[in-house]
């Protein structure tokens, strides 16, 4: 049997990372949950593999979507978010309950893809503007100079004022300058016939017509030089970038690299014998609407049609009441990879406080450090904080690592309030300090429910 041809792997491309390298990258920020990390690492690697497959077979290879099962605060969202950041993939998170709270059914579920495309377009536009920044800045300075000294001024005068603009000396000087008129005409938006869900604002239509004829409506305004530079820089950048190219790049990124994270999917599962028939119908309707989106369909957006066949969907839920088997069988089939995330232990809490590159202890120490106050946590303090977090999670409600945020906020409240008056001091947080600050709250569980 002949092997399928593949193209060469580009080692600099994030898609070329091996599963073990991806897991190592995730380990820098997330503690534990090896099964979930391994699942997303394989999914990402397979995405890269598909790109290197030649011929028609490439289009037949679809991503194996993932269902993450675990309590809140155990790292489900963070794993997906870090994965997207690692690969610079367009990423969009949405709660499945958003489509039931206001009775969303049918085409409204497609807003997920429209929002994802919007994110990708804005990201590509930002990158493109960075590339033309020098030219755009020069043109912006020229326009501001014309308002300040006129078109007929000498080169010496222009150079002198240009230096003042660059140094910020004229930031608070008021000028009168012509800028693009961004006031909406008529307001609102309308549906495009034959394109469900693809709405177009009146302003957008006018803008498109203006572009087609090379004209843009302008308005003369009075503003400060600093404000004018910001507005004109944006205008000149828009003129220099290729809008059509940006849109095509964004759509291509969404179609091939997009990641959609659907949280709280357990909340739209139909629980047997629940007795609430209307809500069951609503939930089942949302599930049915999600099916084509996850399986692969074409969604019409204001930027053009977008195929969802190769977008990676990661769904997650706690499944305390409902079970994964309560989801529609068709939806279960479209989420073939299931991973269960473990509840966090005391040891996990200690690692979360210390090990990640952006750990909570490092964050709080850096924040207080800006006031020239050194914050030091002893090992006994870390252990005590982790112990309290685990206890509250067990006795009140398990919110995972998020419990550490509430505990640290209460623990450091006085220090945060008085830090500006404590410059030059070094504060040591030990187990006794932790106990003094939190023991009264923890002994009163009713109070802890509201405070922690």
Curated annotation (Swiss-Prot):
Signal peptide: none annotated. It is found in: Cytoplasm. Gene3D superfamilies: 1.10.8.60, P-loop containing nucleotide triphosphate hydrolases. Keywords: ATP-binding, Chaperone, Cytoplasm, Nucleotide-binding. The keyword Cytoplasm applies. InterPro entries: AAA+_ATPase (IPR003593), ATP-dep_Clp_protease_ClpX (IPR050052), ATPase_AAA_core (IPR003959), Clp_ATPase_C (IPR019489), HslU (IPR004491), P-loop_NTPase (IPR027417). GO terms for molecular function: ATP binding; ATP hydrolysis activity; peptidase activity; proteasome-activating activity. GO terms for biological process: protein unfolding; proteolysis involved in protein catabolic process. The keyword Ribonucleoprotein does not apply. Pfam families: AAA, AAA_2. ATP binds at residues 31, 73-78, 263, 330, 402. GO terms for cellular component: HslUV protease complex. ATPase subunit of a proteasome-like degradation complex; this subunit has chaperone activity. The binding of ATP and its subsequent hydrolysis by HslU are essential for unfolding of protein substrates subsequently hydrolyzed by HslV. HslU recognizes the N-terminal part of its protein substrates and unfolds these before they are guided to HslV for hydrolysis. Belongs to the ClpX chaperone family. HslU subfamily. A double ring-shaped homohexamer of HslV is capped on each side by a ring-shaped HslU homohexamer. The assembly of the HslU/HslV complex is dependent on binding of ATP. HAMAP family: HslU. This is ATP-dependent protease ATPase subunit HslU. It comes from Rickettsia bellii (strain RML369-C).
């Amino acid at each position: 049997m002949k092997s399928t041809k593949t193209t060469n792997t580009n080692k600099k491309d994030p898609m070329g990372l091996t599963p073990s390298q991806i897991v190592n990258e995730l380990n820098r920020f997330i503690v534990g949950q090896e099964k979930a990390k391994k699942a997303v690492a394989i999914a990402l690697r397979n995405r890269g593999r598909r790109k290197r497959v030649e011929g028609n077979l490439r289009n037949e290879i679809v991503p194996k979507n993932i269902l993450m099962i675990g309590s809140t605060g155990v790292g489900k969202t963070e794993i997906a978010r870090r994965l997207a950041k690692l690969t610079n993939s367009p990423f969009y998170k949405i709660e499945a309950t958003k489509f039931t709270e206001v009775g969303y059914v049918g085409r409204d579920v497609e807003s997920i893809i429209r929002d994802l495309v919007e994110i990708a377009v804005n990201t590509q536009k930002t990158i493109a503007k960075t590339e033309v920044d020098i030219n755009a800045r020069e043109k912006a300075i020229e326009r501001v100079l014309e308002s300040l000294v006129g078109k007929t001024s000498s080169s010496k005068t222009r150079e002198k004022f240009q230096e003042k603009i660059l140094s910020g000396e004229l930031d608070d000087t008021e000028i009168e300058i012509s800028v693009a008129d961004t006031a909406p005409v008529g307001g609102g938006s309308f549906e495009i016939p034959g394109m469900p869900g693809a709405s177009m604002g009146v302003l957008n239509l006018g803008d498109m017509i203006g572009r087609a004829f090379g004209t843009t409506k302008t308005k003369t305004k009075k503003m400060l030089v600093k404000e004018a530079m910001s507005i004109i820089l944006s205008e000149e950048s828009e003129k220099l970038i290729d809008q059509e190219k940006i849109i095509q790049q964004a759509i291509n990124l969404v179609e091939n690299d997009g990641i959609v994270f659907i949280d709280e999917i357990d909340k739209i599962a139909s629980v047997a014998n629940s007795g609430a028939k209307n809500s069951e119908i609503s939930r089942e309707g949302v599930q049915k609407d999600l099916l084509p989106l996850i399986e692969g369909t074409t969604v019409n957006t204001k930027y053009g049609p977008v195929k969802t066949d190769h977008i990676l969907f990661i769904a997650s839920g706690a499944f305390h009441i409902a079970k994964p088997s309560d989801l529609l069988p068709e939806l279960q089939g479209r989420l073939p990879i299931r991973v269960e995330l473990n509840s966090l232990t005391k040891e996990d809490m200690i690692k979360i406080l210390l090990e990640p590159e952006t750990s909570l202890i490092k964050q709080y120490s850096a924040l207080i450090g800006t006031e020239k106050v050194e914050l030091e946590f002893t090992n006994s303090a870390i252990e005590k904080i982790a112990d309290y977090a685990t206890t509250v999670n067990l006795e009140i409600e398990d919110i995972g690592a998020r419990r550490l945020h509430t505990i640290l906020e209460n623990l450091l409240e006085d220090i945060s309030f008085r830090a500006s008056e404590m410059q030059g001091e070094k504060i040591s947080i030990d187990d006794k300090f932790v106990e003094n600050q939190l023991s009264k709250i923890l002994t009163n569980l009713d109070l802890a429910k509201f405070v922690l």
